[in-house]
Amino acid sequence: MGQGIAKAFAQVDGYEVALCDIKQEWADGGKEKIKKGYARLVEKGKMTQEAVDAILAKITPGLKEDLCADCDLIVEAAFEDMGVKKTTFQELDKIAKPECIFASNTSSLSITEIGNGLTRPMVGMHFFNPAPVMKLVEVIRGENTTDEVNDKVVAIAKEIGKTPVEVKEAAGFVVNRILIPMINEAV
């Protein structure tokens, strides 16, 4: 999912993307997968190589401790494990500049709990697969999410061509809260 989110931002003018992972080779591999995906679009005539090169030039793979100090927005896309997400943001809280916005791409975990103990407000920014194509983004407000942070993330979602849906923190947020009962009914 992180690769798709990186593409969603890099495809828009004005955004530079730090594609971070816990190992440099994993981050490099993520950019390589992005590159291969775009190569297929060039082969099919859906994009020019020049356009692809411009997008790829805006994606820098690396480690959070090397790339996140100057970020304005960090969208975390680790797997759905509360401990992993909390630890990731606690580490980022020591690295990122004070005005950096922290957003989690969680599909169901508590934004409030993820953000407890941080020095800044936390917000949810839940993309849907495939992130570069799907227009919907849930913007989830936790107990400590300020109006300023919420409004900024809504504006950013619009800037990158998404349709933000603002939701309060609740189990499954909006989409999964509707989707799961529908799937259960179908089964």
Language model segments and positions:
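Structural signal for hydrophobic packing residues in well-ordered secondary-structure cores
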Residues: 9, 31, 35-42, 75, ...
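Rossmann-like NAD(P)-binding element
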Residues: 22-29, 40-102, 108-113
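Internal alpha-helical scaffold of NAD(P)-dependent oxidoreductase catalytic cores
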Residues: 14-15, 137-170, 180-187
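A non-catalytic, amphipathic alpha-helix used as a structural packing/dimerization or gating element
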Residues: 25-36, 54, 84, 148-159
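Buried hydrophobic positions in well-ordered alpha/beta secondary-structure cores of metabolic enzymes
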Residues: 1, 34, 59, 74-77, ...
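NAD(P)+-binding Rossmann beta1-loop-alpha1 motif at the extreme N-terminus of oxidoreductases
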Residues: 1-40
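Rossmann-fold NAD(P)-binding glycine/threonine-rich loop
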Residues: 81-155
